[in-house]
């Protein structure tokens, strides 16, 4: 029986070597799909359903069932140990990526070597899986429920063995696989040690205080010092203001010292100024007296208005006196009067009258006896406008804003209706008024019934169109 089973087992094992070579090539292409393969392999029913049924004797069935049970348990142990190691590596990688986004070149080299080891492990696993698949294809699945129970029991035993024997699993592996696992573990430990060192260094730096933190502390200190200085400066300014106010009060108090006190500097200055000003006024009065004497000696007649002005000027105190035209050594009063009369004639304020003889004694009586002459209003250019009636003139001036502060009782004399400097004569003004009236009448005589809308009065009981050219115009009736 043993010989037959061995022969039966050797038969299907020969072509398996060829299949291994073919599957090696496939493994390189399918590296990017490790998760799907593991999910299929981890299921316990894979080897049971994959192999097609084959009719053999019951004695052969028993021997064949006992052989794969042992091999399955060993393979499952290998798969579990590899898968757990891979999951640890894959779980460690994302945590490292989170901790450090920009790894150092040393770390990159270590990661590359770890990736190479992982790829080699994957290849070896696929080889072992291919062997298991080939052996499973040679096995027979018995339709009896007893056979299924035996397989499930073997699976449970293998799980218990995995928990109890973790160390002997590495011994059961071939020497190359063991060396690879040890190298991977050493790399993983090295990486973890390097990360721990870097984290420790970062912690020390944080404890010591980075240069940025130091700069921030310095800035905060400077800001605090600046705030303290500002507060001190404000306090000092307020104190100085208070002191200044006290000093000003003292100075004001000193200025208002009574006259009896021995120290009165302000009053002394005022007195000296008054003393200086007094001789100036006396000097002016002396000069005026001298001028009067000179005029009497020369026989020049003096105006009463000038005398009054001179008398009123005595009350005023002259601070500064500017000299006028220095070219004329002697001011000719007669010439000045003649020039003023010519200006008045041209402006229309006074009529052309014969030169009058003035006497100093009778000047006041003659002026009182003569009626006051019209000196013109203060309305500027509207004084030159000619009006037919006095009422019309008053209305116009009121409309223009006149007589707000003056009484409208004054009237122009009839002789002053015509003046030389008027803008228009009577004839030209009449022509202008006629033309304006014609324009006004023409504008008012226009017919407003030509159109419709704002500004047009539509005739009642008539139909009109908004738009005659439009076909769909609306008819409106009143």
Curated annotation (Swiss-Prot):
Biased composition (Basic and acidic residues): 143-153, 297-307, 340-357
Keywords: Isopeptide bond, Nucleus, Phosphoprotein, Ubl conjugation
Residues bearing PTM Phosphothreonine: 314
Broad class of the protein's primary localization: nucleus
Name the UniProt record assigns to this protein: Lysine-rich nucleolar protein 1
Subunit structure: Interacts with ZNF106.
GO CC annotations, alphabetized: nucleolus
Cross-link entry Glycyl lysine isopeptide (Lys-Gly) (interchain with G-Cter in SUMO1), positions: 250
Compartmental location: Nucleus, Nucleolus
Tissue expression remark: Expressed in testis.
Region (Interaction with ZNF106): 310-478
Sequence ranges of Basic residues compositional bias: 17-27, 73-82, 120-129, 154-165, 204-222, 265-274, 286-296
Modified residues (Phosphoserine): 51, 59, 142, 261, 312
Disordered: annotated span: 1-231, 258-314, 340-378
Cross-link Glycyl lysine isopeptide (Lys-Gly) (interchain with G-Cter in SUMO2) per UniProt, renumbered positions: 7, 140, 250, 275, 287, 309, 323, 373, 393, 395, 427, 462
Induction trigger: Down-regulated during myoblast differentiation.
InterPro entries assigned to the protein according to its UniProt record, in alphabetical order: SMAP_dom
Organism: Mus musculus (Mouse)
Biased composition (Polar residues): 33-45, 54-63
